[in-house]
């Protein structure tokens, strides 16, 4: 999965480096692999799995940069299940929600409450732009990115 993600532009370079450093050691790689497998394929409610995944990422070995960031905890499920899961870039998403008039419940500490709020925001956007026929949450994420980015 780390190789798959490295082919995207979803994570900033400092996040990619922090992840690579975290999984260099056998124990870091094992912790990451088991945690990611449980998050993607484990049993139980998504909220509980998400919280466990955040704990795993928070426990990964680190050098200088923190590994536990919103982009890092959301990117892998977004790649694996774009029909139902979305990716969070905090600044852009917060600005997009503000522009959209959506009360996005954001916390800088990754956790289920914020992610559940993001999924609600995605559902609202999907409903509102249904005539544009978004195929999945990649399309919704793209819409959010354009709305919240000052580049467009």
Task: Identify the residue ranges that each predicted region occupies.
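An N-terminal alpha-helical hairpin/helix-loop-helix interaction module that forms a charged
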Residues: 1-66, 82-152
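Cytochrome P450 catalytic-core helices
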Residues: 73-78
């Amino acid at each position: 999965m780390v190789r798959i993600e490295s082919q995207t532009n979803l994570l900033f370079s400092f996040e990619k480096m922090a992840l690579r450093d975290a999984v260099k050691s056998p124990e870091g790689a094992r912790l990451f692999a088991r945690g990611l497998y449980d998050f993607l394929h484990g049993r139980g409610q998504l909220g509980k799995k998400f919280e466990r995944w955040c704990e795993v990422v928070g426990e990964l070995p680190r050098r200088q940069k923190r590994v536990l960031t919103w982009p890092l905890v959301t990117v892998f499920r977004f790649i694996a299940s774009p029909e139902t899961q979305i990716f969070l870039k905090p600044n852009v998403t917060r600005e997009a929600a503000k522009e959209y008039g959506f009360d996005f419940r954001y916390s800088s500490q990754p956790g289920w409450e914020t992610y559940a709020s993001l999924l609600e925001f995605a559902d609202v956007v999907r409903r509102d732009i249904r005539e544009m026929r978004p195929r999945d949450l990649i399309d919704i994420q793209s819409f959010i990115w354009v709305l919240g980015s000052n580049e467009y």
